[in-house]
Amino acid sequence: MKKTAIAITVALAGFATVAQAAPKDNTWYTGAKLGWSQYHDTGFIDNNGPTHENQLGAGAFGGYQVNPYVGFEMGYDWLGRMPYKGSVENGAYKAQGVQLTAKLGYPITDDLDVYTRLGGMVWRADTKAHNNVTGESEKNHDTGVSPVFAGGVEWAITPEIATRLEYQWTNNIGDAHTIGTRPDNGLLSLGVSYRFGQGEAAPVVAPAPAPAPEVQTKHFTLKSDVLFNFNKATLKPEGQAALDQLYSQLSNLDPKDGSVVVLGYTDRIGSDAYNQGLSERRAQSVVDYLISKGIPADKISARGMGESNPVTGNTCDNVKQRAALIDCLAPDRRVEIEVKGIKDVVTQPQA
């Protein structure tokens, strides 16, 4: 048992440098181990010679990590072949088994984990003996189940690759009456494991902020002669048809999120006061009609501009006849509509 205590001390001494954090939750791992296998309390019957209790041990294992603290492992262990000699009999003993254990761990740091395993091993033990007196040889084997206890530390080399330093103890491997011995075994091993599904999750990319809405301003000019009879402010049928066409264009600009200003203009025939009033009435007629079509009343306004800002300039100064002057000044008689609307900017998703 003194050797067992030494082995446990060596295992714990590796704590500071050989360890790993537990795998991610609900992932699988597999690995292999190699180390020093030592048999204890061998007590061979009719054996009074040397027994080679220290052997090479090895194994393979696989496991499922439930969470950082709990996992389950299943593995195969080769515990080594132990020769012995005596004055009457020489022989060898070997043992191997399949174990199933619960693995209880505790993370010390992001890369360091200390753990214990508790469970059982289904083993097979074989002996081969040669009688030095009679020259006869015999082979025997035994099977059974024994408890398994293990403790160790793990260290993450990479997210997928891990190492472990472990000491494992298995009780009573064999029946002395069947195979001549009933030893215990301590296995100090260094293992390497590969853990599946440890890749970093794809980073969550924050969606790009929605582009600021684009404000568009458009100007429309309608001839008053199309909208109204001369010197009148009541819309003609053809004027309503013209505004119907205009409304479809305004809808595309979404005036509900913008504003509409209707500007009425007259020519220079008549007094300034009269022309100002006529331009206001004409602008209001257009506003009323567009409101009836669906433009919100709080988003549209009328403004009379009178005879200001003539577009004909001085081209009609020499026209004296009234009918001809009315025709010449027709471009000045107009309704201008200024629309400021919100246009949604649609961005294409990146591939």
From Swiss-Prot:
Disulfide bonds join 316-328. The gene is ompA. Residues 206-213 are annotated as: 4 X 2 AA tandem repeats of A-P. GO terms for molecular function: porin activity. Sequence repeats lie at residues 206-207, 208-209, 210-211, 212-213. One of its GO terms (biological process) is monoatomic ion transmembrane transport. The extracellular loops are most variable in sequence, and in some bacteria confer sensitivity to phage and/or colicins. The record marks 73, 164 as: Part of salt bridge gating mechanism. Residues 1-21 form the signal peptide. Residues 215-343 form the OmpA-like domain. SUPFAM superfamilies: OMPA-like, OmpA-like. With TolR probably plays a role in maintaining the position of the peptidoglycan cell wall in the periplasm. Acts as a porin with low permeability that allows slow penetration of small solutes; an internal gate slows down solute passage. Its main location: membrane. PROSITE patterns: OMPA_1, OMPA_2. The lineage of its organism: Bacteria, Pseudomonadati, Pseudomonadota, Gammaproteobacteria, Enterobacterales. It holds the Pfam family OmpA. This is Outer membrane protein A. It is found in: Cell outer membrane. It is a multi-pass membrane protein. Keywords: Cell outer membrane, Conjugation, Disulfide bond, Ion transport, Membrane, Porin, Repeat, Signal, Transmembrane, Transmembrane beta strand, Transport.
